[in-house]
């Protein structure tokens, strides 16, 4: 654990503050990129300057990462069996995980909490990541925090961009005809068998949801199905529209959703952008949902899938504790690959570039990859995206009124198609873990696809998996059949 003399720290700050203005201008130039990070992970003395940069030019909020992390706790308490579980077994496992993570955070954060409380500093603990967020931390307190052996590092609150969609067309039609995406992946064939996702709950972390929309009003789970950390609103709402569109693509009625019989829940982490602290709060909510005031968490209400149409940077290991906790709880994480395809190879963003999350690229009606869709390999060398799915001109619900619709393009629209497909699979055969679900999905794709505009890495786009199409375009009928046969 690095320790610093405060005088040396101030000297370093004074020396390096000369570059702060230039760095801020550079950050502005990068601001339009998907997943742009307005700050850099902070470690050692040079990183403390990044904290000063943030306090001068950003949100004044830092995140203190504890040295012990969460992985040893999860390894010790979570049931790592890959067997198919009953729902009761899944809920008991989640309860064990939540109890252990809470106790671990309480013990490891004790000295830090005492220090912050004595200084009269506002803070909030996140047990899912074993971190503490602090608002307006004075510089003189930073050295004391870093001197604690229980503290690993300080990072500052990141601004995370939503996966920005491309508007295609507006529509107020209330047609019940299935969208082209659901038809393309043969979700409609699954519906014909009577499976529309019954018994499965899907969560999203996004801009909220217009819960009264005609496509979504009937299948919200109700209590413990909504959390707005900033405003503590009592019922779902969405001032942006992005979250309504993505949710309806997963579970919406009137032809919008892949799994219209599934239930939904949501946590509002974003406006036009999201913050890392809000993502942490919502990730924790998904593991143990609370009432609308953030109290009385109930692991029995945890969703089976969390769909995320946002991302930031590349190789961001900070998200790993969140993914580890969800995986241990058999909550399957789905992420959009990103809309930075114009940058070429290795443009897939985090957290979808993790081995423990599904990353989804976007295709059009002819199965061609959208020009905007990010491709691999990931910066950690993994083949990404994992799968591709419809994501061009996807018609879904919008937030203008209860019968408002819009067609959008983006990997934000593709990830919900995979989330809905997984919901259909879990409805047919509940209880799969992430690794088993990946095995089922990867063996069930359609691979007669157009040649990609470019190939990345060492393999051709005709060999699967590859860094353009992953394992191929999802096929819900094949996935459900494979789940039933597993």
Listing of model-derived features with the role each one plays in the protein:
Residues 47-166:
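Inhibitory N-terminal propeptides of secreted protease zymogens
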Residues 338, 465-468, 473-486:
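Secreted peptidase-domain scaffold signal
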Residues 52-59, 75-76, 153, 178, ...:
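Subtilisin-like serine protease catalytic core
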Residues 4-24:
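Cleavable N-terminal signal peptides of Sec/SRP-targeted secreted and luminal proteins
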Residues 286-316, 336-337:
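Short acidic, glycine-rich surface-loop motifs adjacent to enzyme active sites
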Residues 27-41, 144-201, 213-215:
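Protease zymogen maturation seam
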């Amino acid at each position: 654990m690095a320790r610093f003399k405060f005088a040396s720290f101030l000297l370093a700050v004074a020396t390096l503050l000369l570059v702060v203005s230039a760095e801020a201008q550079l950050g502005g130039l990068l601001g339009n990129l998907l997943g742009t990070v307005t700050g850099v992970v902070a470690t050692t003395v040079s990183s403390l300057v990044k904290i000063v940069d943030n306090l001068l030019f950003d949100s004044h909020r830092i995140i203190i990462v504890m040295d012990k992390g969460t992985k040893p706790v999860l390894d010790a308490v979570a049931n790592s069996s890959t067997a198919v579980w009953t729902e009761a077994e899944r809920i008991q496992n989640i309860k064990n995980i939540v109890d252990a993570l809470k106790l671990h955070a309480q013990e490891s954060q004790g000295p830090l909490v005492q220090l912050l409380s004595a200084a009269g500093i506002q803070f909030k603990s996140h047990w899912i990541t074993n971190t503490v967020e602090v608002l307006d931390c004075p510089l003189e307190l930073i050295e004391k925090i870093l001197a604690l052996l229980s503290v690993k590092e300080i990072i500052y609150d990141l601004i995370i961009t939503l996966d920005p969609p491309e508007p295609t067309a507006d529509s107020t039609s209330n047609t019940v005809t299935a969208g082209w995406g659901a038809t393309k992946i043969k979700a409609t064939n699954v519906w014909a068998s009577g499976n529309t996702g019954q018994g499965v709950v899907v969560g999203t972390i996004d801009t909220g949801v217009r819960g009264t929309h005609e496509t979504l009003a009937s299948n919200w789970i109700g209590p413990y199905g909504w959390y707005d950390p900033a405003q503590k609103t009592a019922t779902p709402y969405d001032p942006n529209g992005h979250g309504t569109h993505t949710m309806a693509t997963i579970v919406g009625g009137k032809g919008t959703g892949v799994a219209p019989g599934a239930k939904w829940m949501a946590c509002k982490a974003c406006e036009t952008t999201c913050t890392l602290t809000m993502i942490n709060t919502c990730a924790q909510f998904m593991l143990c949902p609370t009432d609308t005031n953030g109290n009385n968490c109930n692991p029995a209400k945890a969703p089976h899938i969390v769909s995320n149409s946002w991302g930031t940077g590349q190789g961001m290991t900070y998200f790993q504790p969140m993914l580890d906790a969800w995986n241990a709880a058999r909550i399957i994480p789905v992420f959009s690959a990103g809309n930075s395809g114009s940058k070429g190879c290795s443009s897939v963003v985090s957290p979808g570039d993790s081995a423990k999350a599904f990353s989804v690229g976007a295709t059009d009606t002819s199965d061609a990859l959208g020009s905007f869709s990010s491709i691999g390999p990931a910066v950690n060398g993994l083949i990404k995206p994992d799968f591709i799915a419809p994501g061009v001109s996807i018609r879904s619900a919008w937030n203008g009124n209860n019968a408002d619709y819009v067609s959008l393009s983006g990997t934000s629209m593709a990830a919900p198609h995979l989330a809905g497909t997984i919901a259909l699979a879990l409805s047919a055969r509940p209880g799969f873990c992430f690794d088993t679900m990946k095995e089922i999905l990867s063996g069930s794709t359609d691979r007669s696809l157009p040649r990609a505009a470019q190939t990345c890495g060492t393999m051709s786009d005709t060999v699967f998996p590859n860094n353009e199409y992953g394992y191929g375009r999802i096929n819900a009928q094949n996935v459900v059949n494979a789940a039933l046969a597993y």
